[in-house]
C-alpha cells in the first residue's frame, strides 16, 4: 500500500475563525476524502461547521471526536442524519465518539463512560433506522438528561442515512466495546500506547490493547470494520513554530496520562516532570510546553518543516499498516497556521509519500 493512500482525512479544530475553517476545508477537499472536526464544548459549534463544510465542499465530514457527556444524543443523531443528506456519491458522514478528554472532565464528572458511549451509539442507530425509541431503555442517558422514562421519540424523516460510527480510545474496555458495537476504531499517535515511542520500543503489541478490540469483534454482528490511525502532526515552513505547536499538543497528553502508561513506552519521569509541575502550579499550557523536551514531543507528534515531516510520517504509517490499520488521517495540531499547514501537506508532503 502506498503510504499516501492510507491518508483519507484531515482533522481541523473549532478554535479558529469559522469562515476561515470552511476556506481551509475547501483547500483540503481537493486531497482528502473526509474533514474531521474536534468537539471540545468550549470551541465553535461542531455541527454548524460540519454543515457549512459539507454544503460548500461536498467532502465527507466527521467528528473526531464527540462524546456523550453534556451532549444530547437526539440532537447528535439528528445532526448526523441531516449531514448525510448533503453527501454526494462516494462520500459519507462519520460519527467519531469517545469518552471525553481533559477539557470535558474539567467541566463535569465522567461517570460510567463506556456504558454512556454504548447507550449513545445504540440510541442513534435506532433513530437512524426510523424506529421509535423509549427513553427508559437508555437509563444512564435518561437520568443524566432528566428525560421522561415513558417518553418516546422517532425520526420519521430519515431514510437509513449512511453514517459510520467509529470509537476513539486506548484502554482495553473502550476498545473491546468499539470492536463489538462500532463500525471502526480510531487510535491516535499522540497517545503513548499507540505512539511512535510504542512502535520504536517494540512495545506496541503489549501496550496497544488491540487484543481487546479483537475480542469485541468476535462478538460483533457488524460486518464492516475500519481501523483508523490518527497521525498527530504539526507542519510549517517555520520549524520552530511547528515544533512549538507540537510541544503544546504533547503537553496536553503527558499531563493527563498516568505515569505507568508513559513509562511502558520508554518515557522517564524526568522527561515530563517539569511540564506537569508547571501545569499544576497554574503556569498555563504554553509555559508548561516550553519545559517539555522536543525529543519527547517528537515521539508523540510529528513536527517540523515539510522535509522534516515526510520521513517521520512515512515511518509511522509503515508501523501503522503493519499493525493492521487501513485508514489514516492527519490530526492535531496540524500546524500553527491551519491554512499554511493544509497547503504544505497537499503540495509538498503527500506527493512525496506516493
Residue spans of the language-model regions?
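Active-site-adjacent structural elements that line small-molecule/cofactor binding pockets in enzymes
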Residues: 1-354
